[in-house]
């Protein structure tokens, strides 16, 4: 992008509109980085609820390690000329490593399903047996019908490979993780065209332990991530080339990702905003059709899935489920026992209390939201403390709840190996925690540098990742909190972090 003075009126308008999300993105990511320097969020063992705890960090040590890392990278880049072959070798190694470490984690921990994963698995088995009772009465899917997409996937896997074949589902997670790493490289190459950045990204991908530890997690998170990252790539590719062919995989991948995890709609909203800005800037009329399909295809697909299940269950329609307002109401509620805005069963309870009436539940939730807003307005310090605690509880956990998830799932096995127990309960757990803590700070630092530099100069397509991550930060200020929910956005930070460290290790 040209300097502001030399821009046309239209370019100036687009630049100012992008600052609407680039500036708050920088504030969020920089605050996250500073908080991570001084404090770490973690979860203790043997708990039955998700309860974030906090401990002081070691800022001097973190800074010293980062300076050592920068010095080492600077020396290596000066010493060795970076070629296409070297970039390719690093990328291939990062992909092989991702597959290897993910498979190693599967066979090391050998965990089964628990919590919501167990509910979905049991429902998929019931559906295969012709039992659709979870769609009636006080059933799980009466409350959470948005899980039907994931249940459909479980049904297919169980029908083909056998009931409760968790290993196949975990292998699908491995494929999704490798897809994520591969397309992060494609996004970086499309955005930056710098071989040094590609190598830095490969190195950062090798350290992506929070993602690899989720390989055993049977839920929509990892499969949807393996679809949404390539969707982002094809949207960036379209923005840079205006080749219509790239809209097709973007639409298909976005649709499948949203069917497995409804929160992928945050990425969809970011894509819609970027495409509208692109249309204004380049007078690209095809974007209108692109947007219609990008919005309409997920809706049509979801309707088709719901219709199929309604027909199978002999229902007129699938229950509408808990209204979205319930998650916002819950996300704005104080909670001294767990943490502000975390799950407290409010959404389930209020829907049940109102006899599964969506309108009545929505009205009750809006009253709760108004009450929270009045409390915040009357007590500004309480408001600030509320959102600070909510923010650090979910965004300052270096493992994004990966370790506590493995610990919960491991409780369903009595034959864990000594090595598995070492990493779940022993000193190995602390080692993983320390590695992820440094890695977390490193990614946030690099991303903060990228965010700061983007305020002055940026290409529109290169701001899509920033908008996606900002969307995650903003959405979960008000929505139900949870460390696991931030993993997707943390992964999307990697190309930006690689650019940030390229800036620190080069004189350009």
What are the residue ranges of the model-derived segments?
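Transmembrane-helix signature of polytopic, membrane-embedded enzymes
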Residues: 184-207, 458-465
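Extracytoplasmic catalytic/substrate-binding loops of multi-pass membrane glycan-assembly enzymes
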Residues: 109-125, 129-157, 163-164, 361-365, ...
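Loop-to-helix entry region of an early transmembrane alpha helix in multi-pass inner-membrane enzymes
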Residues: 144, 148, 152, 160-179, ...
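Short acidic/glycine- and proline-prone juxtamembrane loop motifs at membrane-interface regions
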Residues: 210-224
């Amino acid at each position: 992008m040209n300097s502001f003075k030399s821009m046309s009126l239209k370019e100036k308008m687009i630049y100012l509109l992008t600052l609407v999300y680039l500036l708050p993105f920088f504030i969020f990511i920089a605050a996250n980085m500073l908080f991570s320097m001084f404090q770490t969020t973690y979860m203790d063992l043997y708990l039955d609820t998700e309860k974030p705890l906090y401990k002081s960090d070691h800022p001097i040590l973190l800074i010293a390690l980062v300076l050592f890392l920068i010095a080492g990278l600077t020396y290596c880049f000066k010493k060795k000329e970076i070629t296409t072959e070297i970039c390719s070798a690093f990328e291939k190694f990062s992909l092989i490593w991702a597959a290897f470490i993910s498979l190693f984690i599967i066979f090391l921990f050998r965990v089964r399903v628990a919590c919501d994963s167990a509910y979905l698995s049991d429902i998929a088995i019931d559906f295969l047996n012709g039992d659709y009772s979870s769609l009636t009465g006080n059933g799980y899917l009466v409350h959470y019908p948005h899980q039907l997409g994931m249940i459909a996937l479980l049904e297919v896997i169980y029908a083909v490979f056998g009931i409760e074949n968790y290993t196949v589902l975990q292998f699908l997670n491995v494929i999704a993780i490798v897809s994520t790493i591969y397309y992060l490289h494609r996004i970086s190459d499309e955005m930056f065209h710098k071989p040094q950045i590609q190598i830095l990204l490969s190195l950062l991908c090798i350290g992506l332990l929070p993602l690899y530890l989720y390989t055993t997690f049977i839920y929509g998170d990892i499969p949807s991530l393996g679809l949404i990252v390539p969707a982002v790539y094809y949207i960036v590719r379209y923005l840079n080339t205006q080749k219509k062919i790239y809209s097709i995989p973007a639409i298909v991948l976005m649709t499948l990702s949203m069917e497995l995890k409804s929160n992928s709609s945050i990425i969809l909203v970011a894509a819609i905003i970027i495409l509208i800005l692109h249309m204004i800037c380049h007078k690209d009329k095809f974007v209108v059709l692109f947007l219609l399909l990008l919005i309409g295809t997920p809706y049509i697909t979801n309707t088709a899935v719901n219709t199929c299940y309604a027909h199978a269950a002999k229902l007129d329609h699938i229950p509408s489920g808990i209204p979205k307002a319930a998650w916002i109401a819950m996300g704005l509620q104080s909670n001294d026992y767990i943490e502000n805005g975390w799950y407290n069963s409010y959404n389930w309870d209020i829907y049940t209390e109102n006899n599964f009436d969506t309108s009545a539940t929505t009205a009750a939730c809006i009253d709760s939201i108004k009450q929270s807003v009045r409390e915040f307005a009357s007590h500004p310090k309480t408001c600030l403390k509320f959102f600070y605690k909510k923010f650090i509880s979910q965004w300052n956990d270096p493992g994004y709840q990966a370790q506590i998830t493995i610990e919960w799932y491991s409780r369903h096995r009595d034959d864990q190996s000594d090595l598995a127990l070492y990493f779940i309960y022993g000193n190995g757990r602390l080692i993983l925690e320390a590695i992820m803590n440094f890695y977390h700070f490193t990614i946030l630092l690099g991303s903060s540098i990228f965010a700061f530099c983007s305020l002055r100069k940026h290409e529109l397509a290169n701001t899509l990742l920033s908008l996606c991550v900002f969307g995650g930060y903003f959405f979960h200020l008000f929505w139900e909190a949870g460390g696991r929910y931030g993993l997707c956005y943390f992964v999307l930070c990697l190309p930006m972090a690689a650019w940030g460290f390229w800036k620190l290790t080069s004189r350009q």
